[in-house]
Amino acid sequence: MMQICDSYNQKNSLFNAMNRFIGAVNNMDQTVMVPSLLRDVPLDQEEEKEVTSFQDGDMYGSYVLLKSIRNDIEWGVLQAEERRKEKHGVTTTSLEVSRIEPNDKDLEKLFHYHLSGLHTVLAKLTRKANTLTNRYKQEIGIGGCGN
């Protein structure tokens, strides 16, 4: 019984959610051989109905966004931000981030709130990567477009 419970909990772990997302994006990246074909291809009607903050209008924008998020997860947000600054000619010696420090009592509550949100976002991003992969296969006429 303990093994079943542990297996269920592991399936819902943050680590596994990130691995599912990274795997979906890697699959998308390996499938999409010509990303420029995604330009001006509208999102699914189902996708258009869904209100999200990362809609980019076409599949190419989603492709770029998903790869960017994968890189942020794999390499860290700070490294990605430093690469962007170097690319634009801005260099900084220290990261200046203004933060409001929460009370120690609020840390656990804050952690659970953000963890839950992260699980939700990762699940949506994983679905988006899988949908994009399948839509690309349809667009180029690959048979058997299932997962």
From Swiss-Prot:
It holds the Pfam family Spot_14. Involved in stabilization of microtubules. May play a role in the regulation of lipogenesis. Transmembrane segments: none annotated. Its main location: nucleus. Signal peptide: none annotated. It is found in: Nucleus; Cytoplasm; Cytoplasm, Cytoskeleton. The keyword Transmembrane does not apply. GO terms for cellular component: cytosol; microtubule; nucleus. Belongs to the SPOT14 family. PANTHER family: MID1-INTERACTING PROTEIN 1-B-RELATED (PTHR14315:SF19), SPOT14 FAMILY MEMBER (PTHR14315). This is Mid1-interacting protein 1-B. Keywords: Cytoplasm, Cytoskeleton, Microtubule, Nucleus. InterPro entries: Lipogen_MT_Stabilize_sf, Spot_14. It comes from Danio rerio. One of its GO terms (biological process) is epithelial tube formation. GO terms for molecular function: gamma-tubulin complex binding.
